[in-house]
Amino acid sequence: MTKTFRNPQLTKNGELKHLLSIEGLSRDMITHILDTASQFVSLSDSDRDVKKVPLLRGKSVFNLFFENSTRTRTTFEIAAKRLSADVLNLNINASSTSKGESLLDTINNLSAMSADMFVVRHASSGAPYLIAEHVAPHVHVINAGDGRHAHPTQGLLDMYTIRHFKKDFTNLTVAIVGDILHSRVARSDIHALTTLGVPEVRAIGPRTLLPSGLEQMGVRVFHDMEEGLKGVDVVIMLRLQNERMSGALLPSAQEYFKAYGLTPERLALANRDAIVMHPGPMNRGVEIDSAVADGPQSVILNQVTFGIAVRMAVMGIVAGNSDE
């Protein structure tokens, strides 16, 4: 008898109760998140003195960041507070996990404190899935980045940014450049782009930093930066994930910049109205030139701004769905 696979992110009725990965989400579901985020962007842009809505009033959101973060943790905190939630940021270094307590014991203890939602960043791929399997039916889990695996809210805010500036996904060429091998953002972006109907997704980087199987995901692979940038509409730059590298995969940061750094001259090979994106943190002079990062085609700070609205949308949507 064949066992039916059930997406652990979804309720029995197919609604989103956790956000663990973009993989497995339908085009309609991603579009619904982006449309909802658009409403929150409008709220932030309005003249209202109070930017809050009562969607999560009375709910407790626990931010559990087992890896360092600035943008993601801060924007999740702002998003939860704008939804009127009570927010607790757990200091992992001062918590019992630093004393040997297991991840699930930590989650069980926090659940006993009436947690309604966990936002989790962890170095181990799959950690948010493990948590989602063990929480009570009314508790929701959002993956804020797990190992090399996925960073779904970054992928969604990247899609929101692209849609904002380019409108239609179905006539775009998008290039992702850099350390794709170690990048959870790249994986999430690729799944989102292909699901939303982008006809050509390119991966550009040295052989040592590109994973196998990209072609099977519908991605065109380029090892030559200039060739890969020709005629693209969107350039997504990635930093070198030195903390996840083992062994000498690159000769030096300077050599990397010579071969794969995004300079104004290289950007000129893309379409004239191409936009430049970066999930941060940026390493200027390594993967991107300051003239590009701060230039007129850069939408990097827009990504950060849109990230709040996208995370508000995700939290609001999952909070309304459960198997109870």
From Swiss-Prot:
| Catalytic activity field | carbamoyl phosphate + L-aspartate = N-carbamoyl-L-aspartate + phosphate + H(+)
Q: Which residues bind L-aspartate?
A: 99, 184, 239
State which pathway it belongs to.
Pyrimidine metabolism; UMP biosynthesis via de novo pathway; (S)-dihydroorotate from bicarbonate: step 2/3
Q: How does it assemble?
A: Heterododecamer (2C3:3R2) of six catalytic PyrB chains organized as two trimers (C3), and six regulatory PyrI chains organized as three dimers (R2).
* Protein name per its UniProtKB record: Aspartate carbamoyltransferase catalytic subunit
Which cellular component terms (GO) are annotated to the entry? cytosol
Q: What function does this protein fulfil?
A: Catalyzes the condensation of carbamoyl phosphate and aspartate to form carbamoyl aspartate and inorganic phosphate, the committed step in the de novo pyrimidine nucleotide biosynthesis pathway.
Keyword hit for Hydrolase: no
Keyword Transferase present in the record's keywords: the answer is yes
What keywords is this UniProt entry annotated with?
A: Pyrimidine biosynthesis, Transferase
Q: Which terms does the UniProt entry file under GO BP?
A: 'de novo' pyrimidine nucleobase biosynthetic process; 'de novo' UMP biosynthetic process; amino acid metabolic process
Positions with a binding annotation for carbamoyl phosphate = 71-72, 121, 151, 154, 280-281
The family line of this record is: Belongs to the aspartate/ornithine carbamoyltransferase superfamily. ATCase family.
> What gene codes for this chain?
pyrB
Its EC number is 2.1.3.2
The Swiss-Prot or TrEMBL record annotates one GO molecular function as: aspartate carbamoyltransferase activity
Q: Which domain of life is it from?
A: Bacteria
